[in-house]
Amino acid sequence: MGLGSYWGEVIDVLQEIIPVYDKVNSYISLGKDSEHRKRAIKGRIKNGDKILDAGSGFGNMSKTALDITNGSISIMLYDPLLPMIKNTDRLFEEKPEVACGVFEHVPFKDEQFDAVLSGYSLRDAISLKIAISEMHRILKKDGKWIIVDLGKPDNLITRFGVSFYLKMILPIVAYAAGGKLWLKFATIY
């Protein structure tokens, strides 16, 4: 699994929607994106941890982790889109360390990180199998990989509701939040 040959198209779209990316994501999650990040991170990261934010975008997962730990962690933002990681100033008082690259070829040593954060980004891997292998490689022995993303609910009624929302409601919400760029969101959702 993974995006495979569609990866380039998705990355091109992500680059185009940078100006409205956070706003639209907040709208289409009905304002729950921040809550989901907090719930995933709380209690899973300790003071002094070294964190890789894989597929970091602007660094929202890292910012949440820093807030929860009162800034007592070390973070590295890692994303394939240089314009995303260059625009982190609005979230961070001190510029975090950044690196540009993909999930499948992570330029870090084995067992280097206490935790890896992936917020709404793992679905954009070229190869899910290789991405998982790479994250496992760079995590310390007892490290944690904290993933926040959309999924298909097990309950059939809930699954129908989510599918209906994604196909029928999300485009309207994305248009309201992102203007003409909303059409691009269909490629990544």
Short names for language-model regions:
Residues 1-20:
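N-terminal, positively charged/glycine-rich alpha-helical extensions of SAM-dependent methyltransferases
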Residues 8, 24, 64, 78, ...:
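C-terminal alpha-helical "lid/dimerization" subdomain adjacent to the S-adenosyl-L-methionine
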Residues 52-105:
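Class I SAM-dependent methyltransferase SAM/SAH-binding core
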Residues 115-127:
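A short SAM/SAH-binding and catalytic strip from SAM-dependent methyltransferases
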